[in-house]
Amino acid sequence: MPKMKTKKSASKRFTARPNGSFKRGQAFKRHILTKKTTKNKRHLRGTQDVHETNLKSVRAMMPYA
């Protein structure tokens, strides 16, 4: 059986954690920022956990993470 391949787009977007969860960056922070408030942009900083409903598909895309 051949080796499973990692989806490279997923490996650039998600980072695996030791407990088996994944972290991801926030969306909506690239452009059209003038209409967003400072508070809104501040809350978009940092990372979030991948939601449990999406964990199965992220694990399938990154089999060795």
UniProtKB/Swiss-Prot annotation:
The gene is rpmI. Keywords: Ribonucleoprotein, Ribosomal protein. One of its GO terms (molecular function) is structural constituent of ribosome. Pfam families: Ribosomal_L35p. It comes from the Bacteria. GO terms for biological process: translation. Coiled coil: none annotated. Residues 1-15 have a biased composition (Basic residues). Belongs to the bacterial ribosomal protein bL35 family. It comes from Cupriavidus pinatubonensis (strain JMP 134 / LMG 1197). This is Large ribosomal subunit protein bL35. GO terms for cellular component: cytosolic large ribosomal subunit. Residues 1-27 are annotated as: Disordered. The lineage of its organism: Bacteria, Pseudomonadati, Pseudomonadota, Betaproteobacteria, Burkholderiales.
